[in-house]
């Protein structure tokens, strides 16, 4: 779904780091741990928020509940 704005455990803002994280993985070809460290995510609870997020918003945008199926 949508990236959580804050860490569920400690409350640190993590939502603004998602785009930069994806950019580091794709363009700079860093591994996950290095990218998270460069973003300043030191606590394991905050790292978990980014590592375990599954971005499903694009799939849900294609779904139209009012569309009739034949």
Curated annotation (Swiss-Prot):
Organism: Eremothecium gossypii (strain ATCC 10895 / CBS 109.51 / FGSC 9923 / NRRL Y-1056)
Name of this protein: DNA-directed RNA polymerases I, II, and III subunit RPABC5
Gene Ontology CC: one annotated term: RNA polymerase II, core complex
Record-listed Zn(2+) binding positions: 7, 10, 45-46
Keyword Metal-binding: yes
MF term (GO), any: DNA-directed RNA polymerase activity
Chaperone found in the keyword field: no
Family membership noted in the UniProt record: Belongs to the archaeal Rpo10/eukaryotic RPB10 RNA polymerase subunit family.
Subunit structure: Component of the RNA polymerase I (Pol I), RNA polymerase II (Pol II) and RNA polymerase III (Pol III) complexes consisting of 14, 12 and 17 subunits, respectively.
Localization, UniProt: Nucleus
Described function: DNA-dependent RNA polymerase catalyzes the transcription of DNA into RNA using the four ribonucleoside triphosphates as substrates. Common component of RNA polymerases I, II and III which synthesize ribosomal RNA precursors, mRNA precursors and many functional non-coding RNAs, and a small RNAs, such as 5S rRNA and tRNAs, respectively. Pol II is the central component of the basal RNA polymerase II transcription machinery. Pols are composed of mobile elements that move relative to each other. In Pol II, RBP10 is part of the core element with the central large cleft.
The entry's keywords: DNA-directed RNA polymerase, Metal-binding, Nucleus, Transcription, Zinc
Cystine pairings recorded for this chain: none
PANTHER family with a match to the protein in the record: DNA-DIRECTED RNA POLYMERASES I, II, AND III SUBUNIT RPABC5, DNA-DIRECTED RNA POLYMERASES I, II, AND III SUBUNIT RPABC5 FAMILY MEMBER
Pfam families assigned to the protein according to its UniProt record, in alphabetical order: RNA_pol_N (PF01194)
Gene Ontology biological-process entries: transcription by RNA polymerase I; transcription by RNA polymerase II; tRNA transcription by RNA polymerase III
Underlying gene: RPB10
């Amino acid at each position: 779904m949508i990236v959580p704005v804050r860490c569920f455990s400690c409350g640190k803002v993590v939502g603004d780091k998602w785009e930069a994280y994806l950019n580091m993985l794709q363009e700079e070809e860093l591994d996950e741990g290095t990218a998270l460290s460069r973003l300043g995510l030191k606590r394991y609870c905050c790292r978990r928020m980014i590592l375990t997020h599954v971005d499903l918003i694009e799939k849900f945008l294609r779904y139209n509940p009012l569309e009739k199926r034949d």
